[in-house]
């Protein structure tokens, strides 16, 4: 086995020496810059040592620490559900009672924040979606949440132990970290395969029967406990008769026997407004089988299966030179390159999740909890954006620290770098085109609107710009199941169209979402902001090592303020600065997406439904006519939605008014860092230090202004 025993003695001595990982920092502080450098470099293992094995072990060990923190955090969430929540009340009436897991104590009048959440309880309404997740998992009591919270703490302790053990007692050798095929097999078959299989098993044996009874209106306290379903097959057979046959249908290939609890329905459950849980159980079982197969595809101890190095080196087309040759070496020796790819893919996937959470709501009653829908969409969009910017950051660090041009001749990476001017200038042209045209459509509409010429505007009632391709995609997906899945009762998502609206408890869960001129316009703003973000980030990566302006950029490192004295106009060109600028455009892009989603859903989807079947949308369907002008966005969205919060003082909503104000203060504070020069502050500090010297109270550690890069980092964080 490839481990080294007792490589590093366990001791707390280093904890008492801040900066022990760096010769300069270990000397202690001379100026206040020291504390900033300490924070910047503490986790930059690559700057502590060049030994790849040691770096890998530190990262591996840190991952266990990260998992421990996640377990503690989740434990806290579940504990709040067990101790401070109205979960059991919500479970008995999810359409009228709002989820709450936090009660504010009566200190200085804060208890005004506790609103009436229904069911006789007062508290703060939560929008995390955890109640809906717990119901889907089959949790029926606060005691079960309590047990889960304790279990998570035990797992956290286990993770902390593993982190210590695999660094101090049995540390893997470098060869273990570089054994790609074995890692793929274990991650695919173990994490994704057995992980999905165990979840499918839990769903079939615990979640489905409990949810079936809950949907039928059985009191949660009457429902058998999870272990009873697991241990007593007759209980399950009462709900799903085929359970009485055990595994016989599986081995006799008579799988259709199981179609009671492994379904292929499509659409939403009309009782809960969520996906059919029998569909999701089926899905997880299918996914598990795919990944279990995938986990046996790579060549390890037996001479069969794929070798990744061989696949990559064979991968070349007629116009791509050496193709993927050399990439295997990059990905097994540069963890930054590996991380960049993983962040890009995971970030994109997270954004895909954001869009599926509302169009295919996976948990019961999630779709009618509009605040939660909005929160989950916002959360997943932001996380996805951060991960994608992180991908560019680590790709640039790879270029600066790990890229070796001598081993990369005429392969795809080299060829991309050689024609980077063409890539960047074409991308720049695309950004200019998208920016002028998308914004120009709005400006045209504002002008026509101001001049009183509505017949000359781009709108659904005047000059139409219908998103015909999007409508075609919607239509195809609405009709497809008819021929591809004849037994399915509905298409994958209600949003495609063709079906009816789904209403739960007098509220719209989901309906076919109409797309028109307004969506066409804002879609092109999305295209514009995303392309600009990509332009900035990609330029940062492609020019991380050198440029016409600074040919020796690689020697200056990942982050530097300027190319030294006597070279004016070379500031803010480091790879770090590109990440910094890219972040702003990422914020920009995602703000527009969240605005679009928020208004579109309130205008065209969310609302109440009368006994006669009349739908009243929250903002009365005003998106199509109002969002086609900039003025409409400002007046009918930003102001209309913010005014309630701004006027919330003295009500149970006042926390949001204070947060709204506070967030804008923090944002304004960021501008102080972003719009000021370092010299200004250094000058000011020197005057203040002079005064301290006069009074003989000057500190030993000299105060210094933040460096340019530090100031911008503080600024972008507050922004």
UniProtKB/Swiss-Prot annotation:
The chain crosses the membrane at residues 59-82, 145-168, 184-208, 280-298, 335-358, 374-400, 422-444, 520-538, 578-599, 653-675, 713-719. Chlorophyll a' binds at residue 664. InterPro entries: PSI_PsaA, PSI_PsaA/B, PSI_PsaA/B_CS, PSI_PsaA/B_sf. P700 is a chlorophyll a/chlorophyll a' dimer, A0 is one or more chlorophyll a, A1 is one or both phylloquinones and FX is a shared 4Fe-4S iron-sulfur center. Phylloquinone binds at residue 681. It holds the Pfam family PsaA_PsaB. It is an enzyme of class 1 (oxidoreductase). It is a multi-pass membrane protein. [4Fe-4S] cluster binds at residues 562, 571. GO terms for cellular component: chloroplast thylakoid membrane; photosystem I. Chlorophyll a binds at residues 672, 680. One of its GO terms (biological process) is photosynthesis. Keywords: 4Fe-4S, Chlorophyll, Chloroplast, Chromophore, Electron transport, Iron, Iron-sulfur, Magnesium, Membrane, Metal-binding, Oxidoreductase, Photosynthesis, Photosystem I, Plastid, Thylakoid, Transmembrane, Transmembrane helix, Transport. It is found in: Plastid, Chloroplast thylakoid membrane. The keyword Ligase does not apply. It catalyses: reduced [plastocyanin] + hnu + oxidized [2Fe-2S]-[ferredoxin] = oxidized [plastocyanin] + reduced [2Fe-2S]-[ferredoxin]. Its EC number is 1.97.1.12. It comes from the Eukaryota. One of its GO terms (molecular function) is metal ion binding. The keyword Magnesium applies. The PsaA/B heterodimer binds the P700 chlorophyll special pair and subsequent electron acceptors. PSI consists of a core antenna complex that captures photons, and an electron transfer chain that converts photonic excitation into a charge separation. The eukaryotic PSI reaction center is composed of at least 11 subunits. Belongs to the PsaA/PsaB family. PsaA and PsaB bind P700, the primary electron donor of photosystem I (PSI), as well as the electron acceptors A0, A1 and FX. PSI is a plastocyanin-ferredoxin oxidoreductase, converting photonic excitation into a charge separation, which transfers an electron from the donor P700 chlorophyll pair to the spectroscopically characterized acceptors A0, A1, FX, FA and FB in turn. Oxidized P700 is reduced on the lumenal side of the thylakoid membrane by plastocyanin. This is Photosystem I P700 chlorophyll a apoprotein A1. It comes from Encephalartos lebomboensis.
């Amino acid at each position: 086995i490839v481990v080294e025993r007792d490589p590093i003695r366990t001791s707390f001595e280093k904890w008492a020496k801040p900066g022990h990982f760096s010769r300069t920092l270990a000397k202690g502080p001379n100026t206040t810059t020291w504390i900033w450098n300490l924070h910047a470099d503490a986790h930059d293992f690559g700057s502590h040592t060049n030994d790849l094995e040691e770096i890998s072990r530190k990262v591996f060990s840190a991952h266990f620490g990260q998992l421990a923190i996640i377990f503690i955090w989740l434990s806290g969430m579940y504990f709040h559900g067990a101790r401070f929540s109205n979960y059991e009340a919500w479970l008995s009436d999810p359409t009228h009672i709002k989820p709450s897991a936090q009660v504010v104590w009566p200190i200085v009048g804060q208890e005004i924040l506790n609103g009436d959440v229904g069911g006789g309880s007062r508290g703060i309404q939560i929008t995390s979606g955890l109640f809906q997740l717990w119901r889907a998992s089959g949790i029926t009591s606060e005691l079960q949440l309590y047990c889960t919270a304790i279990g998570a703490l035990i797992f956290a302790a286990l993770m902390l132990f593993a982190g210590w053990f695999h660094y101090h007692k049995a540390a893997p050798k470098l060869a273990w970290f570089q054994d790609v095929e074995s890692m793929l097999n274990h991650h695919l078959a173990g994490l994704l395969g057995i992980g999905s299989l165990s979840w499918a098993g839990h769903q079939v044996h615990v979640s489905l029967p409990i949810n079936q009874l809950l949907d039928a209106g059985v009191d949660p306290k009457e429902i058998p406990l999870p272990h009873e379903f697991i241990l007593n097959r007759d209980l399950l057979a009462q709900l799903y008769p085929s359970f009485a046959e055990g595994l016989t249908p599986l081995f006799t290939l008579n799988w259709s026997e199981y179609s009671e609890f492994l379904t292929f329905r499509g659409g939403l459950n009309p009782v809960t407004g969520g996906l059919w849980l029998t569909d999701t159980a089926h899905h997880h079982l299918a996914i598990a089988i795919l990944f279990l197969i995938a986990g046996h595809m790579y060549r390890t101890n037996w001479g069969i299966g794929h070798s990744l190095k061989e696949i990559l080196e064979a991968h070349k087309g007629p116009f791509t030179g050496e193709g993927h040759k050399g990439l295997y070496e990059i990905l097994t020796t540069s963890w930054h390159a590996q991380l960049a790819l993983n962040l890009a893919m995971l970030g994109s996937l997270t954004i895909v999740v954001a869009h599926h959470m509302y169009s295919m709501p996976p948990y019961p009653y999630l779709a009618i909890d509009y605040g939660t829908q909005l929160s989950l969409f916002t959360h997943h969009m932001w996380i996805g954006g951060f991960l994608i910017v992180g991908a560019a950051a680590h790709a640039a660090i790879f270029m600066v620290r790990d890229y070796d041009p001598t081993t990369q001749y005429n392969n795809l990476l080299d060829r991309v770098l050689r024609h980077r001017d063409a890539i960047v200038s074409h991308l720049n042209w695309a950004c200019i085109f998208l920016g002028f045209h998308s914004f120009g459509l709005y400006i045209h509409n504002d002008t026509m609107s101001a001049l009183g010429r509505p017949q000359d505007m781009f709108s659904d009632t005047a000059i139409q710009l219908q998103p015909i391709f999007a409508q075609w995609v919607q239509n195809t997906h609405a009709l497809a199941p008819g021929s591809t899945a004849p037994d399915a009762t509905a298409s994958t998502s209600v949003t495609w169209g063709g079906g009816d609206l789904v209403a739960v408890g007098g509220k719209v869960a989901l309906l076919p979402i109409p797309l028109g001129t307004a969506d066409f316009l804002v879609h092109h703003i999305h295209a514009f902001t995303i392309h600009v973000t990509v332009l900035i980030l990609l330029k940062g990566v492609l020019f991380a090592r050198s440029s016409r302006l600074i040919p020796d950029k690689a020697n200056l490192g990942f982050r530097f303020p300027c190319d030294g004295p006597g070279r004016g106009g070379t500031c803010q060109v480091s790879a770090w600065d590109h990440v910094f600028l890219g972040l702003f455009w990422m914020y920009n892009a995602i703000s527009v997406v969240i605005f679009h989603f928020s208004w579109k859903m309130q205008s065209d989807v969310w609302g109440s439904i009368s006994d006669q079947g009349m739908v009243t949308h929250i903002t009365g369907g005003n998106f199509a006519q109002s969002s086609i002008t900039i003025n409409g966005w400002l007046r009918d969205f930003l102001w209309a939605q913010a005014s309630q919060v701004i006027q919330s003082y003295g009500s149970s909503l006042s926390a949001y008014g204070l947060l709204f104000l506070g967030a804008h203060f923090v944002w304004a504070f960021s501008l102080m860092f972003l719009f000021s020069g370092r010299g200004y502050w250094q000058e000011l500090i020197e005057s203040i230090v002079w005064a301290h010297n006069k009074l003989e109270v000057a500190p030993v550690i000299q105060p210094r202004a933040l460096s340019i890069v530090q100031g911008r980092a503080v600024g972008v964080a507050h922004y």
